[in-house]
């Protein structure tokens, strides 16, 4: 890859810019040698999201119903998403369920995806299944603006399971954006 020739070591911007193709799996649009979260198994897995989620959520309701976190909105629970993982091969293996959020919400440029939760399942035998619960908070859905504030934006979201992905589910956040955490200025 010629990535190292494209980015100055002095440029610390994560987001893509005029002379920067973007850093990390969230922003880089080129072809990676190994994608973030890449792993090899001696078997094949399939996944199915078994949690029934709403199609739409009002941001005001999500933030108003959060009383259990001592006023820290970013810690508010959003959803506990159950993912049934099946070992479709013959070899016993562990599996790490990676939950990413993707979508074009908030100001451009938009990250390709963001890792928001993961869970390792141990020793899934061939032909067997196990369930991973991915716990999402409002911070899982938020983006950090240029001032360092965590903001929950309205828009269309997709929860992706694994890199390919093996499963996905879509939902929409509606209403006005909400500041979850303000960075000291």
Positions of PLM-derived features:
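Intrinsically disordered, low-complexity Pro/Gly/Ser/Thr-rich segments with frequent PxxP/GP/PP motifs
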Residues: 107-144
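A broad, low-specificity signal marking well-ordered, structured residues that form hydrophobic/aromatic
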Residues: 45, 97, 116
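Intrinsic-disorder/low-complexity, polar/charged segments enriched in Ser/Thr/Lys/Arg/Asp/Glu/Gln
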Residues: 78-82, 129-133, 166-168
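Beta-strand elements of well-folded, non-transmembrane domains
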Residues: 87-89, 103-105, 138-140, 163-165
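Short acidic, flexible loop segments centered on an aromatic residue
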Residues: 90-108, 113
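Residue-level signal for secondary-structure boundary sites
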Residues: 55, 91, 107, 142-144, ...
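Secreted, periplasmic, or luminal enzymes acting at the cell surface/secretory milieu
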Residues: 1-94, 149, 154-162, 171-185
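Residue-level recognition of conserved beta-strand edge/terminus positions
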Residues: 82, 100-102, 133, 160
